[in-house]
């Protein structure tokens, strides 16, 4: 997989923005991606040094439309910790 296919989008919430001060960033990643692939993709795209990586598989929520039941899509979140001497990721610092 290409690095741009692994990293889908940044997850920008109040909780994730509070972690940026400690150089921790949260991304939605491809569900098939492994930790080494995610680390390599982050380092390649943003030109940073990753010191830690945690992942979480989030299952889809049950949603109803009348009597029909379906599920939202499942996703995988990756929390990336950068090294002390690494620069910040600019996506999270913009307005």
UniProtKB/Swiss-Prot annotation:
Gene Ontology annotations for the cellular component aspect, listed alphabetically: ribonucleoprotein complex; ribosome
InterPro entries reported for this sequence: Nucleotide-bd_a/b_plait_sf, Ribosomal_uL23-like, Ribosomal_uL23/eL15/eS24_sf, Ribosomal_uL23_CS
PANTHER family per UniProt: 60S RIBOSOMAL PROTEIN L23A
Single GO MF descriptor: structural constituent of ribosome
Subunit description: Part of the 50S ribosomal subunit. Contacts protein L29, and trigger factor when it is bound to the ribosome.
Protein name: Large ribosomal subunit protein uL23
Species, as recorded: Leuconostoc citreum (strain KM20)
Its job: One of the early assembly proteins it binds 23S rRNA. One of the proteins that surrounds the polypeptide exit tunnel on the outside of the ribosome. Forms the main docking site for trigger factor binding to the ribosome.
Annotated keywords: Ribonucleoprotein, Ribosomal protein, RNA-binding, rRNA-binding
């Amino acid at each position: 997989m290409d690095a741009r296919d692994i990293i889908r989008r940044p997850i920008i919430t109040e909780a994730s923005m509070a972690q940026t001060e400690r150089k921790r960033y949260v991304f939605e990643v491809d569900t098939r991606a492994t930790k080494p692939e995610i680390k390599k993709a982050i380092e390649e795209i943003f030109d940073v040094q990753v010191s830690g990586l945690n992942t979480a598989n989030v299952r889809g929520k049950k949603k109803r439309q009348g009597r029909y039941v379906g599920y939202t899509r499942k996703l995988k979140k990756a929390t990336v910790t950068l090294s002390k001497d690494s620069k910040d990721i600019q996506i999270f610092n913009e307005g």
